[in-house]
Amino acid sequence: MFQINDNFQKLPGSYLFSTIAKKVAAYQEANPDKEIIRLGIGDVTQPLAPAIIDALHKAVDEMGNAATFHGYAPDLGYEFLRKAISDNDYKARGCDISADEIFVSDGAKSDSANIQELFSANSRIAVTDPVYPVYVDSNVMAGRTGTYDAQKETWSNVIYMPSTADNGFVPELPKEVPDMIYLCLPNNPTGTTLKKEQLQVWVDYANKNGSVIIFDAAYEAYISEADVPHSIYECNGAKTCAIELRSFSKNAGFTGVRLGFTVVPKELKCGDVSLHAMWARRHGTKFNGAPYIVQRAGEAVYSEAGKAQLKDQVAYYMNNAKTIKTGLAEAGFTVYGGVNAPYIWLKTPDQMTSWEFFDYLLENANVVGTPGSGFGQIGRAHV
C-alpha cells in the first residue's frame, strides 16, 4: 500500500491566511450589511499602473498573431526581463549581479518555500520570531524541524531568534550555528529593518560559519531611509553566502498577476558544488517559465513611466500605513513599523491574545487584522 509524507501531518492547523479568510467569510455571511476593511493579508488595492497595462495589452496582441506568438517561456526567464532586473535593481545600486544569476518565477512565496530543497534534510534553520510562516512550514514538510510543542508553538530543531521591542526588533546572532538563516528585511510582520552596517554583521557571520542566508527583500521598494540597504548584495561578501528573493507583488501590485525572482550568485558554493547550478537544474525540472505576457508586464516596471507611476503607488500605501499608525498611537495603542515597510505591528491591549483582539476588531470595527500568533510565539500578544 502507498505511504504518505508523514511530515505534512506535523503541520499545526491550517495555513494562517487560510484561517483568516474562513473566519472573515463566516462573519460576512452572518453580517451581509457590514462593509469590512480587510487588512489581514498583504494584498494591494490599487489597479495595475498604466505602463504595465499598456505592456500587457501589447503582449496579448502579440499572442494573437502567428508571427509574434510565444509558447513556453525559457525556464529561467526571458533575457529582456533578467537584464532589466540586473540593470535596475542591482547594477544601479553598485551590486555586481549579472542577468544569468537571476531566476524568474511566479512569485516570491513559492521560491521562499522551494529554496530549502537545495539543502540536506539534516540542515538546521534559524528564523526570527515573529516570522513569515512559509519559511517554517516548508521546512516542516521537508522533515527538517523536529517535533512541535503546541504549548510553546515552537519546533525542537529550529533555532529561534527573538525580535522584540526590547531589542528594537533586531535579532541577535544565534549562538548555535545554523545552516540556513532566514531574514526578511524590511520585515514582515514587524515593519522594521536593518541598517547596512547591521546587515554586514550577518553576512560576516554567515561567511565565517559556513551558513547560507535566505534574504527575502520583497518589501525593498518601501524603504525610505538612506542608510537601509535594498539588497543584501550591497554588503561585502554577500555573494558567497546569500540567496535573495524578490517579488513584483509588493512594488508593482502583481498579486493577481504573479511574478517574482530569486538571485543565486555563481560564487555561492558548498565545497565544489554550485548552488547556482543546482537551482538552475531544479528550476528546469519543476518550472516551465512565467508567461510571456506577465514577463513583459514585469519589464514595464523598469520603464521610466513605470518607475514614476509605481513610486506614486508606493507612496499611497505608505501614507495609508502612516495614517493607521498615527491613529492607533493617538488612540493609546503601542505600535511599531510603518517607516520602511507598509506594516504596522500593534501590541494588543488588556493582555488580550492576538486571536481575541482579531475577533474584537472584526466584530466591533469591521476591520480584519492578522493575529500575531500566526507568526510565532512572540506574536501572541500582537496583531
Predicted regions and their residues:
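Helix C-cap/helix->beta junction micro-motif
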Residues: N31, K208-N209, A331, A365
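Conserved core segment of the aminotransferase class I/II
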Residues: V140, Q151, E234-A315, K322, ...
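Conserved PLP-binding active-site segment of the aspartate aminotransferase-like
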Residues: P342-M352, N366-H382
